[in-house]
């Protein structure tokens, strides 16, 4: 399956046909394919890459992995759910990519003891009832019912280039 530009038109190849079109609408989402961490246990059903409903995690131990707005917003939303134990793990020592208001809300909940912050840290293993996190050269094993990985996405860059789509990378400010 492919899309290539050909003389001002697009040739769209699917598993069933080849079509020509003057325009093509790509509905691939904003993030593309979620970025995985390639850690043992990441294929368990308790691992997701986007939080849909914080209520589904009521009374659970939840690990959120990431340092951008999606991760901070997920942790903050989970903190509002009764009896939920939230840990946020991020590989860097500070949140360079998250908006100030998200960092401030997170800091407040960390001070209140609603969110445990582990940074810099690295998720090393996911088990059915626990996770192993490396921090300060020490592995901590935490009870765990769910893992939400907010590590961004991988765009289909080569596919888009072949289709004649010009891309420009822009970086936000903290």
Each model region followed by its residue ranges:
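Glycine-rich dinucleotide-binding loop and its adjacent helix/turn
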Residues: 28-81, 86, 167-174
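Short, well-ordered coil/turn residues that connect adjacent beta-strands
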Residues: 22-23, 28
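A Rossmann-like FAD-binding core segment of flavoenzymes
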Residues: 1-13, 18-19, 81-169
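Short, conserved acidic/polar surface loops in the N-terminal third of protein domains
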Residues: 8-10, 23, 34-39
